[in-house]
Amino acid sequence: MKAKELREKSVEELNTELLNLLREQFNLRMQAASGQLQQSHLLKQVRRDVARVKTLLNEKAGA
């Protein structure tokens, strides 16, 4: 997910996106804990996407 795409979204859409990413992160962590996760790079990717969304939410709150 690109930051440019996220900047075009509203605060409500960003909050929805954040919830979806957190759910996905939880599911990936459960798969990793049970040894079922084949693509371990997804954990890092989702974690960074969560950080991007949170950063944009903070920027929009300050502006």
UniProtKB/Swiss-Prot annotation:
An example Gene Ontology biological process: cytoplasmic translation
Pfam families: Ribosomal_L29
Key words of the record: Ribonucleoprotein, Ribosomal protein, RNA-binding, rRNA-binding
Any one Gene Ontology cellular component term annotated for this protein: cytosolic large ribosomal subunit
Observed effect of gene inactivation: Cells missing both S17 and L29 grow very slowly and have a rather unstable temperature-sensitive phenotype.
One GO MF term attached to the UniProt entry: structural constituent of ribosome
Function: Binds 23S rRNA. It is not essential for growth.
Xref: NCBIfam families: L29
Assembly and binders: Part of the 50s ribosomal subunit. Contacts protein L23, trigger factor and protein nascent chains. Might also contact SecE and probably does contact SecG when the SecYEG translocation complex is docked with the ribosome.
Family membership noted in the UniProt record: Belongs to the universal ribosomal protein uL29 family.
Name of the protein this chain belongs to: Large ribosomal subunit protein uL29
Lineage: Bacteria, Pseudomonadati, Pseudomonadota, Gammaproteobacteria, Enterobacterales
The encoding gene: rpmC
